């Protein structure tokens, strides 16, 4: 586990307070595309997609729920099987398919994965991350969450 800024263990008493905090445990981070794997697992478990389900990724640009989305240059997909949506980390593909999820069920799955609470690792200062309850979700949450935004992990 690594954290920055660092300090010299031999000079601990002179280390600035901020440098001795273990940011990996304490600081919530929006992990972005890592959460696409959680979203994919939920979609597959719910029977919404299979690895071979074709998804229209609209050649890299789309508007979903009033939000303009784009994929990384060089990773633009048209019609593609869901497994390629994951392989190329398509924002558009994952967001479009995730629109089929029920909010309450989605939240239950994210909680079951342990998001929004400490892992219980035996290290001091572990934060819980952030997973807002469904009542705080907005129309844009349905486009942010599948891509790993509006939630954070420690």
PLM feature segments, named:
Residues 1-33, 38-154:
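Beta-lactam-recognizing serine transpeptidase/beta-lactamase-like catalytic domain environment
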């Amino acid at each position: 586990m690594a954290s920055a800024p660092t300090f010299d263990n031999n000079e601990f008493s002179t280390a600035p307070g901020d440098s001795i905090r273990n940011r990996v445990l304490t600081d919530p981070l929006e992990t972005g595309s890592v959460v696409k794997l959680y979203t994919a697992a939920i979609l597959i478990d719910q029977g919404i997609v299979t690895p071979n389900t074709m998804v229209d990724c609209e050649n890299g640009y789309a508007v979903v729920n009033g939000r303009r989305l784009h994929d990384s240059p060089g990773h633009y997909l048209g019609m593609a099987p869901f497994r390629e949506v994951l392989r190329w980390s398509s924002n558009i593909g994952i967001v479009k398919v995730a629109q089929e999820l029920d909010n309450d069920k989605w939240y239950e799955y994210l909680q079951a994965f342990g998001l929004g609470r400490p892992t219980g690792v035996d290290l001091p200062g572990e934060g819980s991350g952030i997973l807002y309850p469904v009542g705080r979700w907005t129309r844009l949450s349905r486009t942010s969450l599948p891509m790993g935004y509006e939630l954070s992990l420690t």
